[in-house]
Amino acid sequence: DGKLYGPDPYEVYPGDPHDHTGYGCYAPCIVKALQSALDHEGAADAFEVVDETGKTAAQLCEYLDAGMPVVFWATLDFTPVPEERDHWLLADGTDFAWKCHEHCLLLVGYDDEHYWFNDPWHNHGVCAQPKALVEDCHAAQGLFAVTLKRK
């Protein structure tokens, strides 16, 4: 019928995460994966998975202060989200519009002017980005964030 069908990135990762053709997933998917990992490793009694979607980077610093990094959504290389979207139909027939340049990083620190990330994209490693730019890119991708909290 010429229509493209695909999975819901709130539930699963569309595509291959090891290939540039993969898309990405959102916080609820990562929450499930982290919970499964904690259960498998016998660590669910020690940690709680927390979906902190809706919080700014500044608000997430409380976790960094407690020694806990945050899985953080922004954009590839902290560039603007393009206007164009990739579209596909979900199983229920809903049109899903993917915001391009979605990227997941690990927020690991901050100082007066920057947030610090472990960034797997092109082996960037630990990198600093200006706070205002980070907040803009985080908001553009939906303010998704996931972390662990010690019980």
Regions found by a protein language model. Name each.
Residues 1-68, 125-126, 149-151:
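Cysteine-nucleophile protease catalytic domains, especially the papain-like/related folds used
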Residues 2, 7-10, 20-23, 44, ...:
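Generic intrinsically disordered, low-complexity segments enriched for polar/acidic and small residues
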Residues 8-16, 26, 76, 83, ...:
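Generic detector of bulky aromatic hydrophobic side chains
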Residues 36-40, 75-88:
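Short regulatory "switch" loops immediately downstream of catalytic or recognition motifs
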Residues 38, 60-64, 68-76, 92-99:
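Catalytic-core segments of thiol-dependent peptidases
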Residues 41, 70-71, 141, 145:
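Short secondary-structure junctions and interdomain/linker hinges
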Residues 48-49, 69-74, 106, 116-118:
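Structural recognition of the beta-strand scaffold that forms the well-ordered cores
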Residues 80, 84-99, 104, 108-151:
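Noncatalytic regulatory segments and standalone regulatory/sensor domains
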